[in-house]
């Protein structure tokens, strides 16, 4: 178990990751770009604006499944490495019960489990970083400390580097290295897995076929695993040829939130909608394990020096408030066009812990976050019982200029068939974002440029029963 001086591993990137919702859900929702704040009749849309849950006219059961490809192209020192991962993708499962009309009010109740985000991603890059070594940072951070005091001072990797003979100390606690850090080839690999799913209890009501109101109690849960392998290979030196640092991090969490929404239908086919999302109040459980290996000129390998916090620790995260506005034009039974705007107030996120000190994280949130703006647009064309859909969304980064993260774009195309009781829909989407990747602390580390693309293919089947 580590001493209380340890610097905990939560980061502003974790806050950004767990605060973003990409709504990987039903095929109809994704096919029209997620622009459903003023529309409804879709389970994934109910997680966005629960007022649209009142648009369902019949009891319905729906299931969305498919596949997801995650690709990364990373450029460093003139070379590019490409990684591709593919696998199964759950989108949504939902049930709505259309209750009998009472006194002019129509009520729907139900539940839905929706995919909110997918964290699956792998990134690999390598290249010459001559004169720039992680050992430089470890030596600088160790200066003035007795090696036996490094752990108590929270300098875990510095302690591991000393124990692994990557650094050495003289009697005055000045640190040096036997590695040839003027001739360095660095290799960086990060493998991320997991996602966020949200279970919601939904209710909605409709009055006079004009006003729609709804609410949702959301229970999101997160599973996230990150494995990083960072290696340096040195030219000829006194004794050290290379080292590997392996970092394993696991985070799981469950929370709750409340969503409220309203919609209004005008006589001329226009519809307007608005929704407010409270923060998701998460309780996170986290654990990690690091290993360091050192290789020497004689071919020997030092047994790994392992640093483990043996018991998982907990911390709390409150994600940002979110506000949504939408307007759409419905062309009778021919289709619709729709536009949404969403404001994600990243600077309202907060963190705390009763057992560890993570005050620095709120300071980073205040210093490095900004408002994130999302615009979604979509259209649906009806051809008798067949439907064609297209959509686009644009999102600005919630991190300010201190982080080189580009805006996120997503385009989608889809189609569907709607019978009397059975509907089948599919969608293919492409979501792209970019960011600078630092191998370690940005103050010391070289950076690579990464382009990340997600390509979900989702099928939805819905079955309706009864009549209202």
Language-model features and meaning:
Residues 27, 39-48, 54-130, 194-197:
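Outer-membrane beta-barrel translocator/receptor signature
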Residues 20-38:
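N-terminal targeting signals for Sec/Tat export/insertion, comprising classic cleavable signal peptides
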Residues 48-49, 445:
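Short structured motifs
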Residues 1-13:
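Bacterial Sec-dependent N-terminal signal peptides
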Residues 3-5, 51, 65, 390:
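Residue-level signal for alpha-helical transmembrane segments in multi-pass membrane proteins
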Residues 10-24, 98-468:
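Outer-membrane beta-barrel porins/channels
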């Amino acid at each position: 178990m580590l001493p209380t001086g340890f610097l905990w591993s939560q980061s502003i990137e974790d806050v950004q990751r767990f605060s973003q919702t990409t709504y990987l859900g039903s095929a109809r929702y994704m096919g029209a770009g997620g622009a459903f704040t003023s529309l409804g009749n879709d389970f994934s849309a109910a997680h966005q604006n629960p007022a649209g849950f009142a648009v369902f006219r019949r009891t319905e059961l729906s299931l969305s499944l498919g596949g997801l490809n995650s690709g990364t192209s990373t450029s460093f020192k003139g070379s590019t490495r490409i990684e591709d991962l593919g696998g199964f993708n759950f989108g949504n499962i939902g049930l709505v019960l259309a209750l009998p009309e009472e006194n002019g009010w129509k009520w729907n109740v139900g539940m839905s489990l929706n995919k909110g985000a997918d964290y699956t991603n792998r990134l690999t890059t390598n290249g010459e970083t001559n004169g720039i070594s992680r050992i430089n940072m470890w030596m600088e951070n160790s200066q003035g400390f007795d090696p036996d005091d490094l752990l108590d001072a929270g300098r875990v990797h510095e302690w591991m580097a000393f124990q692994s003979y990557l650094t050495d100390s003289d009697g005055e606690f000045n640190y040096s290295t036997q590695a040839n850090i003027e001739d360095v080839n660095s290799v960086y690999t990060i493998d991320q897995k997991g996602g966020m799913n949200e279970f919601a209890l939904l209710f909605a009501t409709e009055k006079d076929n004009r006003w729609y109101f709804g609410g949702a109690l959301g229970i999101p849960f997160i599973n996230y695993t990150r494995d990083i392998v960072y290696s340096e290979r040195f030219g000829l030196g006194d004794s050290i040829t290379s080292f590997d640092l392996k970092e394993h991090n696991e985070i799981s969490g469950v929370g709750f939130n409340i969503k409220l929404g309203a919609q209004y239908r005008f006589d001329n086919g226009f519809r307007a909608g608005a929704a407010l999302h409270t923060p998701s109040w998460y309780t996170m459980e986290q654990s990690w394990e690091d290993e360091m290996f050192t290789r020497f000129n004689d071919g020997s390998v030092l047994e790994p020096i392992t640093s483990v916090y043996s018991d998982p620790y907990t911390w709390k995260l409150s994600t940002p408030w979110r506000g949504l506005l939408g307007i759409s034009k419905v062309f009778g039974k021919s289709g619709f066009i729709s536009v949404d705007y969403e404001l994600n107030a990243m600077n309202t996120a907060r963190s705390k812990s009763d057992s560890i000190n993570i005050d620095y994280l709120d300071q980073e949130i205040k210093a490095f976050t900004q408002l994130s703006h999302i615009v979604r647009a979509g259209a649906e064309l009806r051809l008798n019982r067949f439907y064609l859909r297209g959509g686009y969304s644009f999102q600005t980064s919630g991190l300010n200029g201190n982080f080189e993260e580009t805006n996120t774009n997503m385009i989608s195309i889809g189609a569907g068939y709607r019978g009397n009781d059975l509907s089948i829909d599919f969608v293919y989407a492409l979501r792209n974002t970019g960011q600078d990747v630092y191998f370690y602390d940005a103050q010391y580390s070289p950076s690579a440029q990464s382009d990340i693309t997600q390509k979900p293919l989702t099928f939805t089947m819905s079955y309706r029963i009864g009549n209202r």
